[in-house]
Amino acid sequence: FNDSYFKKLIINNFEKNNVSKDSIILEGRSSRKEYLACYNKIDIALDPFPWSGGISTFEAIWMGVPVLTKKGHNKFVSHQTESINHNSGMSDWIAKDENEYLSKAVKFSSNINELEKIRKNLRKITLKLPSFNTFLFAEEFNKALWEIWDKFIIQNQ
């Protein structure tokens, strides 16, 4: 969000929907460390649609920020955050449609005590999940590569 025209466009769209510009922070380019530190300013991450987050969702959850998403429809990429939330024990953060997305955003943002509890424990919870277990991922990926190699050898004998 380094471009002032684009920033203004985004803020105007929020203001048209009764969201004050004072409650919006648009960050520009930054170092990786600064980027991750920005998550400390966020209560809830709102997943965009129809193209949901991927790495940004993992980063938000890792930094203790719950991500509200809308159930994906026909494209793989529309299901990424839905899958991440489901596997992170955050299924209640998946809305079935736009109306539920809005109502959940209002509901979750209104319960500061619950948000604080989630933020405090989210990283601990995710560390126990397979999707955040890098050793398990590496082991499974290695196994898959060997299976592919074995099939290749058999097919090319």
Predicted regions and their residues:
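Acidic donor-binding loop of glycosyltransferase active sites
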Residues: C38-W51
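C-terminal amphipathic helix plus adjacent low-complexity
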Residues: K7-K16, I25, S30, S103-Q157
